[in-house]
Design a protein with these regions (language model features):
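Bacterial Sec-dependent N-terminal signal peptides
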Residues: 1-21
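Feature for soluble, non-membrane regions of globular proteins
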Residues: 20-224
Length: 224
């Protein structure tokens, strides 16, 4: 009987460990650190409610499945084979984890020389890129994301995806490694900007963490 109880207790601990596979990383700044572009209330709700829910619901969706032993990238790469719950929550968790890192209270960060060169060669100028990226977000009907990604040939491209899809998924038309993602779900901006998504997209550039985007660009190129 005692052995059975110990075994049962071990199973409980194992289940708890499995359900904690994917966790939010701590927010790298205070909720009010981006005021002027992203208000504190929006950031708190976005991170502590929406972001937390995607991680928790992803763990529930993969419980008892082979995806428990996979990395998030592996899960995203075979989205076409997975349930809507896994697709939506894996995408939501990945997208938000990226989103928190590409924002910063640090002022006037700039792309690295290598990334700036690639942006100029691809889009003509940094301002032209920002305009194209903002348009991708503004034109996304309903909820979704705008992306700057690196394709299989190491080239930059801008795209947008619906809901919580992203360019890592095998179901999207334009595939690549995201290095910058802008959330255009209403929960990302509605408390401050209401229906003025374009104003939100304009303001987000003021708190963009180009150091992080540049780092992700280098990492994406190193895997090509």
């Amino acid at each position: 009987m005692k052995i059975m109880k110990i075994a049962a207790l071990g199973a409980v601990f194992a289940a708890q460990f499995t359900l904690a596979q994917f966790k939010q990383t701590p927010l790298p700044y205070a909720y009010n650190a981006l005021e002027g572009s992203v208000d504190a209330q929006t950031m708190e709700i976005h991170y502590s409610k929406h972001g937390a829910a995607y991680a928790a619901n992803l763990n529930k969706a993969i419980a008892g499945t082979p995806q428990e032993k996979q990395t998030l990238i592996q899960i995203l790469s075979e989205t076409s084979k997975l349930t809507p719950a896994v697709r939506n929550n894996a995408g939501g968790h990945y997208n938000h984890e990226l989103f928190w890192t590409i924002l910063t209270p640090e002022k006037n960060t700039q792309p690295s020389a290598k990334l700036a060169k690639a942006i100029n060669e691809t889009f003509g100028s940094l301002d032209a890129f920002k305009e194209k990226m903002s348009k991708a977000g503004a034109d996304r009907f309903g909820s979704g994301w705008a992306w700057l990604s690196v394709d299989k040939n190491g080239k930059l491209f801008v795209s947008s995806t619906p809901n919580q899809d992203n360019p890592l998924m095998d179901i999207v038309e334009e595939k690549g490694t995201p290095i910058l993602g802008i959330d255009v779900w209403e929960h990302a901006y509605y408390l401050k900007y209401q229906n003025k998504r374009a104003d939100y997209l304009s303001a987000i550039w003021n708190v963009l963490n180009w150091k992080e985007v540049s780092k992700r660009y280098d990492e994406a190129l190193s895997k090509k």
